[in-house]
Curated annotation (Swiss-Prot):
Record's protein name: Ribulose bisphosphate carboxylase large chain
Gene Ontology annotations of biological process type: photorespiration; reductive pentose-phosphate cycle
HAMAP family hit by this protein: RuBisCO_L_type1
Gene that this sequence comes from: rbcL
Family, similarity comment: Belongs to the RuBisCO large chain family. Type I subfamily.
Compartment(s): Plastid, Chloroplast
Provenance organism: Lupinus microcarpus var. densiflorus
Known function: RuBisCO catalyzes two reactions: the carboxylation of D-ribulose 1,5-bisphosphate, the primary event in carbon dioxide fixation, as well as the oxidative fragmentation of the pentose substrate in the photorespiration process. Both reactions occur simultaneously and in competition at the same active site.
Residues flagged as site, Transition state stabilizer: K325
């Protein structure tokens, strides 16, 4: 017959290839698929592969001008999810040529751009991605990474301590700077702009930057330690964001901050490049992540957003606590914490890791634990997150009955006590409360904190 065969056709004929060997250069995705009643899983999986790569709903004659076999995504394996009715994990392989080099934005537009509103699916969740070495190498990644950050700050062998300045909205720049000074003077390494602090009428960004820089240098001079404050450079336009980062660099501060999901990956990658070129560390907040990752059967798991951030660039990222006010399951959280820090992570389904990921020496990111944590959580946090982490106590510092500086002292004493106990070989899991109690005997600030927040 002449021409091509017009009409609607089953996706699974073209896009379901169960015997297909994946290539080392493919991007692999694991989707949790919930098909509509009556839709077979093979068709649902194939539909996902098609819609997120070369497919469209009907045969088009321009298909003849390209090599589908070379460019199509393939659903190469489907398995039922244990304990769930009518849920499947569909594995899809995408040829590398479908993606623009060094663009997280394009990667997401392709893989999750269109397919989530698909009629044949009740729900769809992207659980994990395997980024091939060849694609990882097209990204700059974190501006500096864990080792360089430790060298810049001259802080080794312990987690770093931070504090988000509260009340998050309403303080004047000068009072804000004062709170920053008190926390840093008391013994914290970092203080942080809240994610919603950008440049509002009650406190414009330039004033805040100035007073925070002053606070930082004063605390630095008095303690002999290097201090930082995450100056939030997030803005309404990329140009304005870079302008703020430039001002931070001119002040000579060590670190700026960005909300990478609300700001967007394009803006984030631009900022990360600026930060590497100009010696700024970059702290990343994940505001809006729960909109995307909270539902168990639809959206995207946070580990995917975390991987994307490591490609796009950031030196710190918030990653849940396992113990405070925001939810997080221990094994799963540790799974993506390792994905952020380590150079090579083995596939381990019990920790939610669907693929072995090699980062080929891309710098690592420090996970930040924050949200409803206080001194009694310190042993658990030290044990769970280890040395390469930032522990952030907002209310857990500023809520101290004697004020901000004593709150900072309490946290620093608790941390040093836990690190020392661990180095002496004690078991933080079972002796944690005991360790904190012992330390509070010679630190009145810590004793007061222990009173306010009961174990």
């Amino acid at each position: 017959s002449v021409g091509f065969k017009a009409g609607v056709k089953d996706y699974k004929l073209t896009y379901y290839t169960p015997d297909n060997q994946t290539k080392d250069t493919d991007i692999l995705a694991a989707f949790r698929v919930t098909p509509q009643p009556g839709v077979p899983p093979e068709e649902a999986g194939a539909a996902v592969a098609a819609e997120s790569s070369t497919g469209t709903w009907t045969t088009v004659w321009t298909d003849g001008l390209t090599s589908l076999d070379r460019y199509k995504g393939r659903c190469y394996h489907i398995e039922p999810v244990a304990g769930e009715e009518n849920q499947f994990i569909a594995y899809v392989a995408y040829p590398l040529d479908l993606f623009e080099e060094g663009s997280v934005t394009n990667m997401f537009t392709s893989i999750v751009g269109n397919v989530f509103g698909f009629k044949a699916l009740r729900a769809l969740r992207l659980e994990d991605l395997r980024i091939p070495n060849a694609y990882v190498k097209t990204f700059q990644g974190p501006p500096h990474g864990i080792q360089v950050e430790r060298d810049k700050l001259n802080k080794y062998g312990r987690p770093l301590l931070g504090c988000t300045i509260k009340p998050k909205l309403g303080l004047s720049a000068k009072n804000y700077g004062r709170a920053v000074y008190e926390c840093l003077r008391g013994g914290l390494d970092f203080t942080k702009d809240d994610e919603n602090v950008n440049s509002q009428p009650f406190m414009r960004w330039r004033d805040r930057f100035l007073f925070c820089a002053e606070a930082l240098y004063k605390a630095q001079a008095e303690t002999g330690e290097i201090k930082g404050h995450y100056l939030n450079a997030t803005a309404g336009t990329c140009e304005e964001m870079i302008k703020r980062a430039v001002f931070a660099r001119e002040l000579g501060v060590p670190i700026v901050m960005h909300d990478y999901l609300t700001g967007g990956f394009t803006a984030n990658t631009s900022l990360a490049h600026y930060c590497r070129d100009n010696g700024l560390l970059l702290h990343i907040h994940r505001a809006m992540h729960a909109v995307i990752d909270r539902q168990k059967n639809h959206g995207m798991h946070f580990r995917v957003l975390a991987k994307a951030l490591r490609l796009s660039g950031g030196d710190h990222i918030h990653s849940g606590t396992v113990v405070g006010k925001l939810e997080g399951e221990r094994e799963i959280t540790l799974g993506f914490v390792d994905l952020l820090r380590d150079d090579f992570v083995e596939k381990d389904r019990s920790r939610g890791i669907y693929f072995t990921q090699d980062w080929v020496s891309l710098p690592g990111v420090l996970p930040v634990a924050s949200g409803g944590i206080h001194v009694w959580h310190m042993p658990a946090l030290t044990e769970i997150f280890g040395d390469d982490s930032v522990l952030q106590f907002g209310g857990g510092t500023l809520g101290h009955p004697w004020g901000n500086a004593p709150g900072a002292v309490a946290n620093r004493v608790a941390l040093e006590a836990c690190v020392q106990a661990r180095n002496e070989g004690r078991d933080l899991a079972s002796e944690g409360n005991q360790i904190i109690r012992e330390a509070s005997k010679w630190s009145p600030e810590l004793a007061a904190a222990c009173e306010v927040w009961k174990e």
